[in-house]
């Protein structure tokens, strides 16, 4: 699963996602993309599940790019622990996804196959998504 090798601070405040994506909102590498229609944090496990689903669907034919990276630590205290005694340990890593972020890209496959692979991947994600073609975003 994806996680950063090294971070400046181990723990971070939660924060929230507001507004639309200013960066990462255009298709840069592939022909087809999966764009988020909502803002949310996506875990490294969800990204991996979507990647596996896509690569199995396109088989050896195409190339898949993951455009998001989980670099936000999510902390959690153990179950049945009393309050206090400091912030909990890092449980998993999240990727912040704003509205309009291109999350995955595919190239080298027909449009129908790319669309079915992206829809399969979107079923693994907690946000509503849409399939886009490179010429749609220009």
UniProtKB/Swiss-Prot annotation:
A Pfam family annotated for this UniProt entry: Ribosomal_L16
UniProt similarity note: Belongs to the universal ribosomal protein uL16 family.
NCBIfam families per UniProt: rplP_bact
GO MF: rRNA binding; structural constituent of ribosome; tRNA binding
PROSITE patterns the record matches: RIBOSOMAL_L16_1, RIBOSOMAL_L16_2
The protein's assembly and partners: Part of the 50S ribosomal subunit.
This protein's name: Large ribosomal subunit protein uL16
Source superkingdom: Bacteria
Lineage: Bacteria, Pseudomonadati, Spirochaetota, Spirochaetia, Spirochaetales
Organism: Borrelia recurrentis (strain A1)
Gene3D superfamilies reported for this sequence: Ribosomal protein L10e/L16
Underlying gene: rplP
